[in-house]
């Protein structure tokens, strides 16, 4: 009774405490950092962005001094600022003339090599290169910074930066740029040096030099290199260990665009998709697109659940993660001679010595000392020799001690062996790299569609290697998640859509070296329409276009796509009209006069994929898609259409006209795709592929229809 009363008292106190904390957190008089987005920079010659931002703050706060209020002013590539505001002040700013949106600055998360060989970009003379243009290509990475001393970013053999470069090297104390790493900016007050390893990893994946004999303690030995090793890189550090704030991210876009980068790579994202006017990555990417800069963005790591993709704007290229043909496996050898195969990146070698196996989830340290602990939960034991556990992940993680992660069936087999054997023994071997013939397969963690903001725009767009990627790393960051890990490495293995994103960034840069004048939409179209068609290796929604988009990126095919689907800023503004943005708001965003007339259907945006969300009540349906293609292949070519239904699809698809005769380069022709059917499964999309072929080029677009059942 006494114990129960004490528990009740403690519970009540906790509830009161949490209530008071909650009240403090949601006090409307508390000042929070808000982003104030004001669209494009006004063209008036006497307009000074920062002065205008200060005037707004003075007016809304009633204070002549706004010291400590203005956090950042966005004034180089677009207009806006971030500031400390109360809720009532936020409301006041939102009602002011010239303001598009005001939203709280949230934190994004980081979305955490043989892969280039796997995609067909072999090292050396086997891959066609245009080194002169590649050396003039600049990629900006908005991430956790960079390790400038890494061999992956050595400037040996590089000339001075391209003349178009307008950036700076402000990396902080003891940070030096060079002719490879030509720019660095910090928005965190930590300096641009990478303390987490993530930014170093992504940058080297896309554009790192070829560095021979790299490995993780002998695992995955080979040459680490990026897709465009001759290109230049610039690091924009927006992330700390606590996250990547909206106001930092928007500042990085503001600078990167004005600095003169050719591409922007963003391997971070939120927990859920946001409306475009409140999504700093979508905002920054829009203004980048308007300046001819493609933004490549990771899809997110919240899969395999549907509607989890966070990168949903059509003006940026959204990347899902897949496996490659190399997997890391860690074998467990039992005392009875049986071998079980698990996953991990285990650099420790027990040299085949067998130790007693102890099974249990919550064991006293004295019971596991000098033994291999077998548990359903990864233990923090410091006295066990090794660990064997189980989970349903389809990728390997680095361990700080000998570890193998078994499938549930193999784990059950191991437990059965322990329970039926008087003195069970075993050993965990060092990880080995094996050939994976089932690749590529979409990783379970990769976020899935459908798109919840623009429901008729298919996302993700493309998939690329993002599982067990070996690339450069920061020696200041732990290789594992165990804080007791004392090892430090220059190259490490990571998995995530963060790792997939820079692969596509590298491909986009590779395309740009052959076609410097291609617009962001043309590069995006080339990547999507030449992708490998993915084969569903599983069942259910996680094995559909909502998982992989148009397919798996094919770098070599993408430099010669034949036909492309072009889009420009005006097309995207019309699309936003159809999303119910007002003419007044869109004039602020675009900087141009805008009149939204009529209803523009999302699905008629000239996008390389076609998607339509149907009403749940639709037992039978007919939808149309209008598209225009531009000939970038050869003159006097004839393209014939072909429809290929995917497994289980009963769609009826017609293309009109079914033949396109292109007399000249850059000629445009339009067509309509009509899709009809009935009784669509509410849990699965129904899909097909439209292929335009002239005998040399095969220009493929996925067609997806789905019920509002997600």
Swiss-Prot record:
Glycosylation sites: 174, 221, 364, 419, 535, 568, 580, 618, 636
Post-translational modification remark: The C-terminal propeptide is autocleaved.
One Pfam family it belongs to: Peptidase_S8
A biological process from GO: proteolysis
All residue ranges annotated as the PA domain in the record: 354-414
GO cellular component, one term: extracellular region
Propeptide: 24-111
Inhibitor I9 domain ranges (all copies): 33-110
Annotated keywords: Autocatalytic cleavage, Glycoprotein, Hydrolase, Protease, Secreted, Serine protease, Signal, Zymogen
Main location: secreted
Protein name: Subtilisin-like protease SBT4.8
Organism from which the protein derives: Arabidopsis thaliana (Mouse-ear cress)
The organism's taxonomic lineage, starting at the top: Eukaryota, Viridiplantae, Streptophyta, Embryophyta, Tracheophyta
This protein's encoding gene: SBT4.8
């Amino acid at each position: 009774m006494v114990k129960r009363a004490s528990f009740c008292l403690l519970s009540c106190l906790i509830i009161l405490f949490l209530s008071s904390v909650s009240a403090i957190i949601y006090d409307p008089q508390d000042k929070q950092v808000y982003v104030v987005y004001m669209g494009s920079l006004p063209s008036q010659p006497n307009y000074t962005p920062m002065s205008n931002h200060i005037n707004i703050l003075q007016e809304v706060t009633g204070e002549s001094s706004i010291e400590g209020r203005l956090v950042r002013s966005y004034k180089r590539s677009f207009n806006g600022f971030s500031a400390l505001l109360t809720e009532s002040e936020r409301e006041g700013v939102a009602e002011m003339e010239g303001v598009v949106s005001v939203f709280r600055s949230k934190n994004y998360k980081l979305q955490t090599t043989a892969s280039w060989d796997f995609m067909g970009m072999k090292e050396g003379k086997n891959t066609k290169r245009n080194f002169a243009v590649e050396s003039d290509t600049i990629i900006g990475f908005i991430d956790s910074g960079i390790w400038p001393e890494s061999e992956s970013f050595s400037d040996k053999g590089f000339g001075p930066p391209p003349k178009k470069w307008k950036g700076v090297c402000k990396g902080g104390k003891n940070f030096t740029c060079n002719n490879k790493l030509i720019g660095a900016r910090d928005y965190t007050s930590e300096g641009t040096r990478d303390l987490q390893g993530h930014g170093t990893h992504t940058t080297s994946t896309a554009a790192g030099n070829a560095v021979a004999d790299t490995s993780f303690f002998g695992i995955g030995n080979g040459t680490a290199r990026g897709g465009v090793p001759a290109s230049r890189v610039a690091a924009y550090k927006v992330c700390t260990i606590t996250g990547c704030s909206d106001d930092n991210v928007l500042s990085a876009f503001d600078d990167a665009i004005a600095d003169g980068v050719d591409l922007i790579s963003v391997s971070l994202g939120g927990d859920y998709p946001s409306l475009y006017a409140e999504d700093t990555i979508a905002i920054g990417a829009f203004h980048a697109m308007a300046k001819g800069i493609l933004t490549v963005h990771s899809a997110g790591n919240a899969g395999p659940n549907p509607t989890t993709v966070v990168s949903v704007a059509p003006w940026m290229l959204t990347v899902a993660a897949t496996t490659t043909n190399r997997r890391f496996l860690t074998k467990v050898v039992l005392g009875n001679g049986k071998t079980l195969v698990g996953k991990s990146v285990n650099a420790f070698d027990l040299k085949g010595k067998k130790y007693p196996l102890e099974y249990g989830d919550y064991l006293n340290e004295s019971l596991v000392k000098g033994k291999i602990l077998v548990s359903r939960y990864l233990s923090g034991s410091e006295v066990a020799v090794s660990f064997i556990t189980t989970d349903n992940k389809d990728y390997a993680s680095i361990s700080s001690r000998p570890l193998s992660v078994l499938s549930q069936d193999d784990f059950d087999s191991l437990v059965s062996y322990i329970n039926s054997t008087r003195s069970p023994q075993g050993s965990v071997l060092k990880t080995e790299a094996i050939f994976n013939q089932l690749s590529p397969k979409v990783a379970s963690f990769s976020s899935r569609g459908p798109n919840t903001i623009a429901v008729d725009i298919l996302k993700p767009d493309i998939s690329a290697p993002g599982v067990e990627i070996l690339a450069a790393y920061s020696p200041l960051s732990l290789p594992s998640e165990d804080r007791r890990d004392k090892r430090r490495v220059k190259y490490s293995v990571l998995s995530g859509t963060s790792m997939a994103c820079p692969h596509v960034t590298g491909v986009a840069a590779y395309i740009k070296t052959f076609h410097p004048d291609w617009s962001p939409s043309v590069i995006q179209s080339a990547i999507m329409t030449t992708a490998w068609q993915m084969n569903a290796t599983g069942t259910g929604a996680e094995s559909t276009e909502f998982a992989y988009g148009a397919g798996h990126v094919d770098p070599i095919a993408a430099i010669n796509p034949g036909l492309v689907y072009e889009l420009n800023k005006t097309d995207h503004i019309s699309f936003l009209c159809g999303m119910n943005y007002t003419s007044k708001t869109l004039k602020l965003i675009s900087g141009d006069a805008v009149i939204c007339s009529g209803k523009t259907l999302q699905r008629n945006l000239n996008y390389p994929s076609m998607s339509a969300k149907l009403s749940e009540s639709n037992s039978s349906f007919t939808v149309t898609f209008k598209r225009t293609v531009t000939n970038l292949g050869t003159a006097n070519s004839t393209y014939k259409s072909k429809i290929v239904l995917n497994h289980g699809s009963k769609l009826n698809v017609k293309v009109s006209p079914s033949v396109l005769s292109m007399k000249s380069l850059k000629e445009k022709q339009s067509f309509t795709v009509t899709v009809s059917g009935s009784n669509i499964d509410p849990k699965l999309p129904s899909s097909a592929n439209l292929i335009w072929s002239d005998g040399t080029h095969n220009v493929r677009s996925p067609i997806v229809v789905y019920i509002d059942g997600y």
